[in-house]
């Protein structure tokens, strides 16, 4: 995961560069590999790409501290977790070749290779092997409808200096977060995590009482656009937004599932075969990375299926790393089911044993990361699994949440 942040003072007040730095520092944990900034005077000047203390030293761009806040009314901040194209070519914010379009992007476009080939056929040239550059070319080719071409998980924001507008989008299922504050005619700010907005002094922490009531009733906070904090919204899944210099914000849904669509006359065997083909293709696309990829294994049908499919897709000499949470309580532990999976596949097994004592010791840190309330200690178990993967040098984990509803 990467971390993105941006602010646009729609009334052309100067931005607070120190606040931009604080906002980006607040999400350093999302991207330890690189740091970058974009400063823009939307009235007349060319955008300026800037560096911070953690910027890749192979890049020769000026430090953000050289500039004064009163010169700019828009800024982007970025923290990178490098997954595709580990070179400095993947640095963000990234510009189009003509310098007119800039992007900050968190996530991965799984079909970037196919899109790259298609866009090359339209005359686009590429200098890197990153999916970020593909998004920029797609935007220049198809405009805002570019998101309809993406197969992936993403949250992105684009500054179009020629049109003087900002375009933002979130993936079809809301895998990547996009929080924002919008004060008409005055301010628009966005971030991967709300702590960036707090660090920059752009949002408060007053609780939204209706959302809190819904949480106590349903046990969920991601029900609509409203977060549990009064003045912070989330861009819904499969939505994009456009913000123009006159302060107008428009949102639209770019994708949906039509429940009226039906496939009639298929045999059970054909349904199963079609599902198998789509599922295998989906897993295979998610293995595209320039860093180590592992799997989260819970013992359930969902993650067990993912591990088994990966085993068939990898070369015969390759061994995948799995990461699992185990429990002393036999009624909660799924170790025997994990054993069945690991014994029949080429797997290097890694286990972590979360305890109630560790849970309470780390609860404050877990709250800091989660930002909104949750109802199950399984959040802590999953957090422990992710930490174990990091300790073992694995950057990307495939997992099964949601898949059990299909299987």
Language-model features, listed with the residues they occupy:
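Cysteine-centered catalytic environments shared across enzyme families
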Residues: 1-371, 382
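Active-site adenylate/phosphate-handling loop in enzymes that bind or generate adenylated species
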Residues: 172, 185, 384-407
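Acceptor-substrate binding/catalytic loop of class I
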Residues: 373-376
């Amino acid at each position: 995961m990467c971390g993105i942040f941006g602010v646009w003072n729609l009334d052309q007040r100067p931005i607070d560069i120190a606040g931009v730095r604080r906002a980006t520092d607040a999400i350093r944990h999302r991207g330890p590999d690189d740091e970058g900034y974009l400063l823009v005077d939307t009235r007349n000047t060319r955008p300026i790409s800037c560096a911070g203390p953690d910027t890749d030293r192979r890049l020769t761009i000026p430090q953000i501290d050289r500039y004064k806040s009163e010169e700019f009314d828009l800024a982007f901040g970025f923290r990178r977790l490098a997954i595709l194209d580990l070179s400095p070519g993947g640095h963000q914010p990234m510009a189009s070749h003509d310098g007119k379009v800039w992007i900050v992007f968190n996530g991965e476009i799984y079909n970037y290779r196919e899109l790259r080939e298609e866009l090359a056929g339209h005359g686009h040239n590429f200098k890197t092997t990153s999916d970020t550059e593909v998004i920029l070319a797609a935007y220049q080719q198809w405009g805002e409808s570019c998101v309809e071409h993406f197969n992936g998980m993403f949250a992105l924001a684009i500054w179009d200096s020629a049109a003087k507008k900002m375009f933002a989008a979130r993936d079809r299922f809301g895998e990547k977060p996009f929080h924002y504050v919008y004060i008409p005619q005055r301010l628009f700010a966005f971030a991967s995590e709300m702590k960036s907005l707090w660090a920059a002094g752009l949002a408060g922490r007053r609780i939204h009482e209706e959302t809190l009531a819904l949480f106590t009733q349903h046990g969920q906070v991601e029900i609509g656009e409203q977060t549990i904090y009064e003045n912070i919204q989330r861009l819904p899944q499969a939505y994009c937004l456009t913000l123009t210099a006159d302060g107008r914000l428009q949102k639209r849904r770019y994708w949906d599932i039509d429940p009226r669509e039906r496939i009639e006359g298929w045999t059970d065997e054909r349904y199963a075969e079609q599902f198998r083909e789509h599922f295998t293709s989906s897993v295979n696309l998610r293995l595209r990375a320039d860093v180590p990829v592992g799997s989260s294994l819970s013992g359930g049908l969902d993650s067990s299926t993912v591990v088994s499919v990966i085993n068939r897709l990898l070369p015969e000499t390759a061994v995948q790393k799995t990461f699992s949470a185990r429990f002393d309580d036999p009624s909660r532990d799924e170790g025997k089911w994990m054993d069945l999976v690991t014994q029949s596949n080429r797997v290097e097994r890694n286990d972590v044993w979360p305890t109630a004592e560790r849970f309470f010791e780390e609860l404050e840190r877990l709250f800091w990361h989660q930002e909104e309330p949750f109802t199950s200690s399984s959040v802590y178990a999953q957090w422990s699994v992710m930490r174990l993967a990091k300790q073992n040098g694995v950057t990307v984990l495939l997992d099964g949440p949601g898949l059990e509803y299909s299987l």
